[in-house]
């Protein structure tokens, strides 16, 4: 790393090689393994191998101890789990028997130990036998309890059928969850196998790393590098000496190239070893973290906190739902019992009330028959009274007609009376007829004619009045006979009505007594109805509360179902993401492997190129030394013309390097370093003519 940061030679005075090149010659690393004896080397190598094997044994022992401790914890957990399961089964069976205690059926519980006596069996057959016996006992007790439940339960209600359908649906969902659990278990087994393979690869890599970190192996590698570089260098020296007849400069150049390559390789090895050590430390820390991960580390993670919060919320909801479910079940049972008792009481009261009402209805039917008969009699009486009124109205009309006939008769009699009075006066005054004269006779005739006319005029009125009187008299006679008959009939009916009246009075007294008793019964029934209404209102309030609680439970159940569906969707998404991530991890691992292979190839190329660069640097240093020597020689033996030519060949900007780069725009010559500096500093104008140029306008003249 320090060689890369070494400053370049910028002047002719700095011709001495760096101090590090003098200090590092690479001879000690090559000569140390040659001084070691064979026995000591073998002993040191065996000690290193034994030490590495002991380290491997210690790692295996630590892993085995951690696994043993984990297995011990799991075995204790499984033992406690089996004990808890056994106690739970016994508690469930005891609770089922307590539920059947009200029916009066007693069951003989077999004498069993209060815990599992064969949890830690070593023999699998005995443990299987123990489990089969335990399962048979639990099945027998459960079948007996369920048979008693079925016999005592009777017909299945629709609620029970709905619950059984819900249980069937939940069992189907449970089977689906079991299938998912099996799939996740298989995936877990596959991941555990992959983890075991990765740990095996890790152990192998750690073993190789320990072997690479061993001092003996490093010495062997250094010796191999020295042996690989030495013959080539010696061969080159021999050939070069053969060709140049013992040219020591070229041998020294080759030697320095070999030493530079060896030092560069040593530096690369140091870098690789440092990287390997850092990776090993990181691997050991990661392994320690993986092995020493505690529950607190998991508790501190955000995923665990989120899962814990969700789990606590679900547990709280489940506890509240269980408590409310238990409370509602107890309240429903109590209400069912009250409902049955209330129904029996209502049926008894209704039967009693119906019997009383039927008896009252019979009495009311009898009363209705009596009332209808009384109504018929009253209707008959009213019709008779109407007929009587009609007859009286007709008699009144007849009386009126008789009065009119009487008036006619009175007028006729008045006219007759007046006529008779006149005739009497005339008779009293009139003399003898024979003594009368013609005039007197004529007068008398006219008078008689007048009387005759008046009599003729009176006769129709008299006849009419006579006819009317005759008719009225006949009618009166007939009416009188009819009234006599009606009077006899009415007298008989009056006697009958008196008898009916006394019977109706008796019936009215009995009805009044019945009405009093019915009113008393009605007051009692109204009190009972008021009590029933109060109970019905209370039941309605309870039903309303229960319906509200049921709606709340349905809503909570719906929210839980939606959350469950969301959790299923999220779990499916997580599974899909894990699958996609696993695919991505596999793709990335393949890509990383390919990239690692490519990087290894590139690294090898870089190593070879770095060694070549070191060799070229050594050659460059020798060339610079030769140049400086020739420069000094030339300066010591140069003339003014040579000095002028030399200054003309030097760059006009730095006066240090020779002109080797020309600008196409103007044709002036400068050194490539100055031109590159001006391009990088954005001073892209010729210092001689100030013409602009670009990177494409630069042209090398010679090398």
Curated annotation (Swiss-Prot):
PROSITE patterns recorded: ZF_RING_1, ZF_RING_2
The UniProt record lists the keyword Metal-binding: yes
Query: For the region Disordered, what residue ranges are annotated?
Result: 1-35, 213-246
Highest taxon above the source species: Eukaryota
Looking at the UniProt record for this protein, which Gene Ontology cellular component terms does it annotate, in alphabetical order?
A: HULC complex; nucleus
* Record's keyword terms, sorted: Chromatin regulator, Coiled coil, Metal-binding, Nucleus, Transferase, Ubl conjugation pathway, Zinc, Zinc-finger
- The record's EC number reads 2.3.2.27
Does Secreted show up as a keyword for this record?
A: no
- Please report which protein family the annotation says this sequence is part of: Belongs to the BRE1 family.
Q: What is this protein called?
A: E3 ubiquitin-protein ligase BRE1
